[in-house]
Amino acid sequence: MNKMLNILLHTDEEDRWAITCKNAETILKMAEMGNYTVNLEIVANSFAVKSLSADSFASTLKLKDTLIALQDKGVNIYCCSESMNFLEIDSSMILPFVKVVPSGVFHIALRQHEGFAYIKP
């Protein structure tokens, strides 16, 4: 019988994406080895949102490929609309596989209330 884990990874700095993605990959690997079903989310807010914009394509090509691979494994990736507004990033510029939520911190609070484990690499 599979055991269920709900995990949320939070990143708010552009330079934390690599470790956040590595943590996601490790969680998926360990879950598979331990016969766990994982509901894994990555929530980006503040300046980390900049890396999810098509405008930052040149600097984040590897990140984009990594996030697509994670999404293909069932990871949901969320971006904060409040941060987008603050940074003047239009929603049409966000990578198409990223889901926009009204508030990243509120989304995190809701998930914690629902029992998600919170990890900020």
Regions found by a protein language model. Give the residues of each.
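Short helix-terminating capping/connector loops at secondary-structure junctions
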Residues: 2, 34-38
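A cross-taxonomic marker for long C-terminal extensions/tails that follow the last structured domain
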Residues: 53-121
